[in-house]
Amino acid sequence: MGKPKKKSDLSRAELMMMTIADVIKQLVEAHEEGKDINLNKVKTKTSAKYGLSAQPRLVDIIAAVPPHYRRALVPKLKAKPIRTASGIAVVAVMCKPHRCPHISFTGNICVYCPGGPDSDFEYSTQSYTGYEPTSMRAIRARYDPYLQTRHRVEQLKQLGHSVDKVEFIVMGGTFMALPEEYRDYFIRNLHDALSGHTSNNVTEAVRYSERSNTKCVGITIETRPDYCLKRHLSDMLGYGCTRLEIGVQSVYEDVARDTNRGHTVRAVCESFHLAKDAGFKVVAHMMPDLPNVGMERDVEQFIEFFENPAFRPDGLKLYPTLVIRGTGLYELWKTGRYKSYSPSALVDLVARILALVPPWTRVYRVQRDIPMPLVSSGVEHGNLRELALARMKDMGTECRDVRTREVGIQEIHHKVRPYQVELIRRDYVANGGWETFLSYEDPEQDILIGLLRLRRCSPQSFRPELKGGVSIVRELHVYGSVVPVSSRDPSKFQHQGFGMMLMEEAERIARDEHGSSKLAVISGVGTRNYYRKMGYELEGPYMVKNLY
């Protein structure tokens, strides 16, 4: 046996291995003693002890955790726990770059829109620069949907997230404006990437995806109001799509015209109506700080947006206007004909908007993912939501949207857990239908555990499955960290039976109050078996149950 090597004789790789082993030893000891541990502190100290300038990667630490400690330690090591705090791993994918569909009849794209084949960022999709994290992943995979999915799922796994349930977001301009052949190829590959099967068409891909171990619980597609007509909605139902993100940007007709949107505000209201009657969840993209609006008019449009039954979306993505090189807005800004709000005024505005959000709406995002160096004017802070919430605290207002109150997010940010849970019901009218928002909440601490969106379809419903007295469940979601579909973790809120209880109440309301003979559910492809257990059967793209 040779002498043990001195620290100075060891290679960098050997030192890194010793550092990782030491970090894990400290984590195991802390776990055995029931102590909380600051991982960053441990990594910094241990790296310094072994004379390393760089810290070990989280992926390598997770990979080295001994099998019998994985269950206890990996959740504590998870990078970006918010990624799966809502119970689902979100995988964003991008379709190939293509021109905006309304160029052909308005002659140009929207004044604020970067990206696209004709822009300074020519390898990027419309409305993206190619430097956002999702864009960069898509470009690396040459916009191949299969590779984008496999790489992202693998990445989330390595970071310690459960990828048992996946929701896709299809980004990159107006997907529904692309040729049908390409759309089918794209969606087919998303499903195949999860199931491992090679399908010949979308129907076959969906059939195999239903039985896959990694469940596709939903697909979200970004679209425009003029590409959200009956034929588009029917195609999207066939894909397994459950949520739409519709670019609204402004509720003012003059602003839509001046910014060259290429559609009217009336088209927005009609698309909301058609989409909700088909069972989709509707998320609106809105842009405060557009040209010729001003602060007061901006606040008024959001009051209108949440209170007027012609709008009332289920979700909101708030994208304050950014000035980016190569856009029409950049030229206006350069010549002094457009000026962005000051950073402080923008935080004020976002705080006022968040205070208006009703408890049934979820605010998904508060700013774009565009890297700051590409922004000539507009948002100057990367943490706009946090700043706005802090400003609301000062103003004595609070944000009561779905995301702020979710049990998983509350646990990460405030370490609070629900104590007394009760069923809460809120009814409202939106887009020609009667909406009921059912939720399990802890009203004392204002924490949301699960929600269900029930709608009595309007007589104008165009889907044959939903005609003649049918109610539809547009969303059922129990929040809390992802629990693999087959396991029950008593400390996590998914799989505790809240979903079943919400469905029972929805069936009662549909039968006794709506007078409906059937209840339909727009279900993600991978969750259809969950509804089969409750007596639902597949009818077209919906899971349906007779109530009498």
Curated annotation (Swiss-Prot):
Keywords, alphabetical: 4Fe-4S, Acyltransferase, Cytoplasm, Iron, Iron-sulfur, Metal-binding, Neurogenesis, Nucleus, RNA-binding, S-adenosyl-L-methionine, Transferase, tRNA processing, tRNA-binding
Disruption phenotype: Morpholino knockdown in embryos results in reduced tRNA modification with decreased levels of mcm5s2U (5-methoxycarbonylmethyl-2-thiouridine). Morphant larvae display a ventrally curved body where somites present a distortion of their typical chevron shape, being rounded with a different angle compared to controls. Morphants also show disruption of the horizontal myoseptum, diminished somite area, disorganised muscle fibers, a small neural tube and reduced Shh signaling activity.
GO term, biological process aspect, one: tRNA wobble base 5-methoxycarbonylmethyl-2-thiouridinylation
EC number of this enzyme: 2.3.1.311
GO cellular component: cytoplasm; elongator holoenzyme complex; nucleus
Cofactor notes: Binds 1 [4Fe-4S] cluster. The cluster is coordinated with 3 cysteines and an exchangeable S-adenosyl-L-methionine.
Gene Ontology MF terms: 4 iron, 4 sulfur cluster binding; metal ion binding; phosphorylase kinase regulator activity; tRNA binding; tRNA uridine(34) acetyltransferase activity
Subcellular location: Cytoplasm; Nucleus
N-acetyltransferase domain sequence ranges: 397-548
Catalytic activities: uridine(34) in tRNA + acetyl-CoA + S-adenosyl-L-methionine + H2O = 5-(carboxymethyl)uridine(34) in tRNA + 5'-deoxyadenosine + L-methionine + CoA + 2 H(+)
CDD domains: Radical_SAM
SMART domains noted in UniProt: Elp3
Names of the cofactor(s): [4Fe-4S] cluster
Quaternary structure note: Component of the elongator complex.
Name of protein: Elongator complex protein 3
Species assigned in the record: Danio rerio (Zebrafish)
